[in-house]
């Protein structure tokens, strides 16, 4: 995992991330995070709207106007996804983010399980990188952008879960902790 220039975020990611105490680390990992207009329309939480507005004003977030071709491809992706029984459903905002991730090389930020599986199950999207908040946190730690207490490395994940009420799968936390513990061991050498 390395630093990236651009990401595109969907609704579920932004709603959770807006509640996180270290949310500004997002803008240390990425130069710009794009937000499709379709995603903004879904946000109802006042806290999230205020945070997004401030970030747009500071040029940390940038509005992304989706082309009609991207909308059409996103609709096709939804149709394809509905034909794959093992793929949890995705809706238009997630599909738009995946389409833009594919065409522009942006990392897709989401908590949607269906969006996480698309690169594994649909070959056209196999090169799309999809991160949950968990991968973002690990990336921030590995690049020294988020301080980790190596005596309690799991604390960064539990802080996020406490702040957002979003629970990471235990298998995913275990894998993330292995990476962070490896980072801590290297730091001590």
Which residues fall in each region the model found?
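Feature 3881 marks metal-assisted phosphotransfer/nuclease machinery
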Residues: 1-6, 17-34, 38-51, 56-61, ...
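Metabolite-binding pocket within alpha/beta catalytic cores that recognizes anionic/polar moieties
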Residues: 12-15
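Ordered, amphipathic secondary-structure segments that act as subunit-interaction surfaces
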Residues: 63-110
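Short hydrophobic beta-strand that contains or immediately precedes a catalytic carboxylate
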Residues: 8-10, 110
């Amino acid at each position: 995992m390395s630093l990236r220039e651009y990401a595109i975020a969907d609704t579920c990611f932004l709603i959770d991330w807006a509640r996180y105490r270290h949310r500004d680390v997002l803008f240390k990992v990425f130069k710009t995070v794009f937000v499709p207009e379709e995603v903004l329309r879904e946000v109802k939480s006042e806290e999230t709207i205020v945070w997004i507005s401030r970030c747009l004003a500071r040029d940390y977030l940038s509005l992304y106007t989706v082309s009609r071709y991207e909308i059409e491809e996103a609709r096709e992706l939804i149709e394809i996804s509905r034909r794959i029984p093992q793929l949890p459903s995705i809706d238009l905002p997630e599909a738009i983010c995946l389409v833009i991730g594919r065409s522009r090389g942006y990392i897709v930020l989401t908590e949607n399980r269906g969006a996480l599986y698309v690169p594994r199950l649909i070959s056209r999207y196999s090169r799309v990188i999809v991160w949950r908040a968990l991968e973002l946190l690990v990336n921030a730690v590995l690049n020294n952008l988020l301080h980790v207490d190596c005596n309690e490395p799991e604390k960064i994940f539990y802080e996020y879960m406490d702040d957002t009420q979003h629970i990471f799968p235990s298998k995913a936390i275990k894998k993330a902790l292995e990476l962070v513990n490896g980072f801590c061991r290297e730091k001590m050498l």
